[in-house]
């Protein structure tokens, strides 16, 4: 066969991080079928969909079962009823004004952050914080922007911005000119946040260097500390240089239901090969119209329900449940004498392995000796080596049990 493969796929690490974790866990479970594993690795939720969400879902399905209210293909960008509620509830309280045409409903922030790079030329220089959510890097490797990976674990054409304990997990601005910057706050995996003053430095950099910020705000609903920005658009000038991604996965338990959105302000312009300004919003709209048929009507009605008074109350109860879990994890690990980060305005807890044990080795220790599944920090990039991530998304009972098991280990 003469068909040629996309050669850039050969540059990707063999297994996606969470696929490798699942492989190791499945292998161990088969060998030890009686082991009661507590999974605190992948960021999947355990609380069921809120009652108001389920009811809205059912009503929408019933509509599709009636000839008078049946709907076929929906708008690729999303139904106005959900877009308008997004603007009214998620942005207006922050003082951010948006148009319907600037909000795009999708089936996940992972899809959006992975797909958005398709709009840009292969020769753009991207920058990522390190450690980093793997999708940002892998999608650019697939597109041919990364170059080869060196022995140090870094791709040669990607600019890495270390976020470590030495800089309080606040990466420095790039020392060189970059074109596209991926930021995620509250951060995955470290669970840390930026102040408005710190985020403004990134917006200023983007203005000064004609750069674009791709801002992943999937975990903003966990922010409790006053003054921490929930959106990059709270920063003056950000609508000229940023795109924002959000998700209903964690805030409303939609990990299996699939619904999210991104905001592409009409003020954002990029340049073509001749240096002419090109508006970004229509490009994303064109991409979605070609490659995406939209989120189903029942799912969008279900998502809309979280903005009702009852829905907001139910969603907050679930968020509070996970926040309590995060507090249990953080306090328990600190009592063990471990260095712990995150878990305050985030569902993720990032902690230093004891005695400088490498990430995958400590992952195996927790798996085999405590029957707790974690995520090794090295899977998020070289600066993640020597750390592990735990999530607050299991049940409260399992969370307490997991901490008790870990506390009994001899490091």
Curated annotation (Swiss-Prot):
> What's a Gene Ontology MF term here?
L,L-diaminopimelate aminotransferase activity
Q: What HAMAP family does the database record attribute to this sequence? A: DapL_aminotrans_1 (MF_01642)
Keyword match Transferase:
yes
Key words of the record:
Aminotransferase, Pyridoxal phosphate, Transferase
The yes or no answer to whether the keyword Transferase is present is yes
What's the protein called, per UniProt?
LL-diaminopimelate aminotransferase
Report the family membership: Belongs to the class-I pyridoxal-phosphate-dependent aminotransferase family. LL-diaminopimelate aminotransferase subfamily.
The source organism is Methanosphaera stadtmanae (strain ATCC 43021 / DSM 3091 / JCM 11832 / MCB-3)
């Amino acid at each position: 066969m003469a068909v040629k493969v996309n050669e850039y796929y050969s540059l990707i690490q063999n297994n996606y991080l969470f696929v490798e974790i699942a492989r190791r866990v499945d292998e161990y479970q088969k060998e030890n079928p009686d082991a009661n594993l507590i999974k605190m690795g992948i960021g999947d939720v355990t609380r069921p969909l809120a009652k108001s969400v389920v009811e809205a879902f059912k009503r929408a399905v019933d509509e599709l079962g009636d000839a008078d209210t049946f709907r076929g293909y929906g708008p690729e960008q999303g139904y106005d009823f959900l877009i308008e509620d997004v603007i009214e509830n998620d942005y207006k309280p922050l003082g951010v004004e948006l148009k319907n045409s600037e909000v795009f409903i999708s089936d996940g922030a992972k899809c959006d952050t992975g797909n958005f790079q398709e709009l840009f030329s292969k020769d753009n220089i991207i920058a990522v914080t390190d450690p980093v959510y793997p999708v940002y890097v892998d999608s650019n490797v697939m597109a041919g922007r990364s170059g080869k990976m060196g022995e140090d674990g870094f791709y040669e054409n990607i600019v890495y911005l270390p976020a470590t304990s030495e800089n309080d997990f606040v990466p420095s601005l790039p020392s060189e000119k970059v074109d596209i910057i991926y930021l995620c706050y509250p951060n995955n995996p470290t669970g840390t946040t930026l102040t408005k003053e710190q985020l403004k430095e990134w917006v200023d950099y983007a203005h000064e260097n004609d750069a674009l910020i791709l801002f992943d705000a999937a975990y903003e609903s966990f922010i409790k500390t006053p003054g921490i920005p929930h959106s990059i658009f709270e920063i003056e000038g950000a609508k000229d240089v940023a795109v924002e991604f959000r998700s209903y996965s964690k805030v409303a338990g939609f990990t299996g239901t699939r619904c999210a959105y991104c905001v592409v302000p009409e003020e954002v312009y990029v340049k073509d090969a001749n240096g002419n300004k090109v508006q970004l919003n229509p490009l994303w709209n064109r991409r979605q119209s070609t490659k995406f048929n939209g989120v189903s009507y029942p799912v969008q009605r279900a998502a809309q329900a979280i903005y009702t008074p009852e829905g907001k109350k139910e969603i907050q109860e679930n968020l509070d449940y996970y926040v309590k879990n995060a507090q249990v994890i953080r306090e328990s690990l600190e009592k063990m004498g471990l260095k712990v980060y995150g878990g305050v305005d985030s569902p993720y807890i990032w902690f230093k392995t004891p005695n400088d044990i490498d990430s995958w080795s400590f992952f195996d220790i927790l798996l085999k000796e405590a029957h707790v599944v974690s995520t090794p920090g090295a899977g998020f990039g070289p600066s993640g080596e020597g750390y592990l991530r735990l999530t607050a998304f299991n049940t409260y009972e399992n969370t307490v049990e997991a901490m008790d098991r870990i506390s009994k280990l001899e490091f």
